[in-house]
Regions:
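An acidic- and aromatic-residue-enriched active-site/binding cleft used to recognize and process polar
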Residues: 20
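Structured mid-to-C-terminal alpha-helical surface segments
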Residues: 1-15, 25-38, 42-239
Length: 239
């Protein structure tokens, strides 16, 4: 998948990558094993002055992949719309097997990006700060029960990046997102555990124990949690 991302980057398509593939790159650079965070899809942002047509997107991606020497066919299975990303399948031309998918948001608020490198492969991705802010925004609302993987991601992120509360708030504001009250995360721990138990990483990757994940993420987020929850840390009574 990183080869596809490199081909897109080399082509000049106005795409920046985000989510799992960026996190994997950060973890890999920090010394984690490649299989720590496995994924079967690529997430990205496409930002242009003029909204691209379906044909323009498919043709641009296909041309980039062809130039990269990969025998894949790009197929659009979902056109983008309001609050809906474009969905692409990358298909092996020889077997017609769907190798992985790409979800591409189009002309959402522009976010800070940087160049990443994994084993000599370069691509443009959202900044670590943006990645953290996006995941905190999810965990702060009841979306956390559907996006339990963001809790796991924050567990790993906490081992690599410091949490700068002022920069997080600023990043959320710039990307037109808000932070919730964390009531689901704080008050419904057993429901979270249930969601976590059902969740399976792609590729058969082993999950760390839920209690360890929950404890470390709660500590990591202490500066944005409600005062009552934050006070636990001052009293030494965190759970």
């Amino acid at each position: 998948m990183y080869s596809v991302m490199k081909a897109v980057y080399d082509s000049g398509i106005p795409i920046s990558f985000k989510c799992s593939m960026v996190l994997k790159a950060c973890l890999f650079e920090a010394g984690f094993l490649d299989e720590t965070r496995h994924t079967v899809d690529i997430d990205a942002n496409w930002n242009t002055d003029t909204p691209p047509t379906a044909e323009q997107m498919v043709e641009s991606l296909q041309r980039a992949i062809n130039r990269g020497g990969m025998d894949y066919e790009v197929r659009l299975y979902r056109m983008y719309g309001e609050k809906r990303s474009a969905g692409f399948e990358l298909v092996d031309r020889n077997t017609d097997e769907i190798l992985f998918t790409m979800d591409v948001d189009v002309n959402r608020p522009i976010t800070p990006t940087q160049i990443y490198e994994v084993d000599g492969i370069c691509f443009r991705g959202v900044s670590p700060l943006q990645m953290i802010a996006d995941k905190v925004a999810v965990v702060s609302t009841d979306k956390v029960f559907r996006r339990i993987k963001d809790v796991v991601d924050l567990y790993y992120i906490s081992k690599v990046f410091e949490f700068d509360v002022q920069k997080i708030y600023s990043t959320l504001k710039c990307s037109e997102r808000t932070m919730g009250d964390f009531q689901g995360f704080l008050q419904r721990k057993e429901d979270l555990r249930h969601s976590y138990d059902k969740f399976r990483f792609a590729g058969g990757v082993n999950k760390p124990p839920f209690d360890a994940v929950y404890r470390e993420v709660k500590i990591y987020l202490k500066d944005v949690l409600p005062k009552e929850a934050s006070k636990e840390y001052a009293d030494g009574s965190q759970q």
